[in-house]
Regions:
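Phosphate-binding glycine-rich loops and adjacent basic patches that engage nucleotide phosphates
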Residues: 2-11, 22-32, 82-90, 111-117, ...
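Extracytoplasmic/periplasmic sensory segments of membrane signal-transduction proteins
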Residues: 36-131
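Juxtamembrane extracytoplasmic/periplasmic/luminal helical "stalk" adjacent to the first N-terminal
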Residues: 1-63, 148
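Extracytoplasmic/periplasmic ligand-binding sensor regions of membrane-associated signaling proteins
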Residues: 104-164
Length: 164
């Protein structure tokens, strides 16, 4: 004899346990993702604070960026992108960029007539809002050449017209 009542009750208990397990797993996964995001956000925030207070040479900026990418496995790459002519009065573009490629640290300068970084959302929106911003995922053709999301933090330097 088969007791349908018991099998229904067992099925109900099993479904309940599955729901609880799925809920716990989703909360655990969400906590891990949030932890990684918070760690990633701290990296450019700290860089922006140091850039606000200091006047780095080109060599010092390159070393700072390289060490940042080397020492932070959770990020793909990093740039410090200046307003046109702000870092060097003779150069429209100044955006050194270090990134990981096949477990190596690679370097390039981004910014050219074909890649005007100051027109991209990752640069433009934080500047306009004067606050840190996560970009929507995008294919970064010309710099990373991969799908990425960018966390951008504006920074300022004292210029001839005040804070720029």
């Amino acid at each position: 004899m088969i007791d349908n009542h018991n099998s229904k009750k067992i099925r109900s208990i099993f479904k309940g346990n599955l729901r609880v397990s799925a809920k716990n797993l989703s909360h655990s996964t969400l906590n891990k993702i949030e932890s990684i995001i918070k760690a990633v956000e701290k990296i450019p925030q700290q860089m922006a604070l140091s850039l606000d207070d200091s006047s780095y040479s080109k060599e010092e900026l390159l070393l700072l960026l390289r060490k940042t990418v080397e020492n932070n496995p959770e990020i793909y790459g990093s740039t410090i992108a200046f307003e046109p002519y702000m870092f060097d009065a003779d150069s429209r573009y100044f955006a050194p960029y270090y990134y990981k490629n096949d477990k190596e640290i690679k370097f390039t300068f981004i910014g050219s007539e074909s890649y005007k970084y100051f027109l991209w959302d990752w640069y433009k929106i934080p500047k306009e809002k004067n606050q840190s911003v996560w970009s929507e995922p995008y294919f970064d053709e010309g710099a990373g050449n991969i799908i990425m999301a960018t966390y951008s933090v504006p920074f300022y330097r004292e210029g001839k017209d005040g804070r720029e």
